[in-house]
From Swiss-Prot:
Superkingdom in the source lineage: Archaea
Lineage: Archaea, Methanobacteriati, Methanobacteriota, Methanomada group, Methanococci
Subcellular location per the Swiss-Prot or TrEMBL entry: Cell membrane
Segments traversing the membrane: 1-21, 30-50, 62-82
Similarity annotation: To M.thermoautotrophicum MTH1250.
Entry keyword Membrane: yes
Identification of the protein by name: Uncharacterized protein MJ1223
One GO location term (cellular component): plasma membrane
Keyword check for Membrane: yes
Primary localization: membrane
Keywords: Cell membrane, Membrane, Transmembrane, Transmembrane helix
Bilayer topology: Multi-pass membrane protein
Length: 92
C-alpha cells in the first residue's frame, strides 16, 4: 500500500471519528445511534487499514466482529429505549 494512500485513509478516518463523536454527544436517541454507528464503522475500517500496513492476519475477523456487535448493539438499544409503540401515530 502506498504511504500517501495509507496516510490519507488514516486522516479521513480520524475526521470521520471526530464527526461521529460530535454527533454522539448531541441530544436525541437518533443522533446517538448514528454517532455510534459511525464510530463502529471507523474503528473496523481503521483496524483493516492498519492490518494491511503491518500484515496482521487476524484483524479482518476482529473488524467483522466489531461491525456485527455495533449493529446488534444499536438494535438492542432501539428495542430497550424505543418505548411503547401503541402510543405512536399510525398512518391512515
Amino acid at each position: 500500500m502506498n504511504i500517501y494512500v495509507w496516510l490519507f485513509a488514516i486522516i479521513a478516518l480520524s475526521f470521520s471519528a471526530l464527526v461521529g463523536l460530535r454527533l454522539s454527544f448531541k441530544k436525541g436517541t437518533a443522533n446517538v445511534l448514528v454517532g455510534e454507528s459511525i464510530i463502529t464503522v471507523v474503528a473496523g475500517t481503521l483496524i483493516v487499514v492498519i492490518s494491511q500496513k503491518y500484515n496482521l492476519a487476524f484483524a479482518d475477523t476482529i473488524a467483522l466482529a466489531i461491525f456485527i456487535c455495533g449493529v446488534v448493539g444499536a438494535f438492542a438499544f432501539c428495542k430497550v429505549i424505543g418505548g411503547d409503540n401503541e402510543k405512536a401515530k399510525q398512518p391512515n
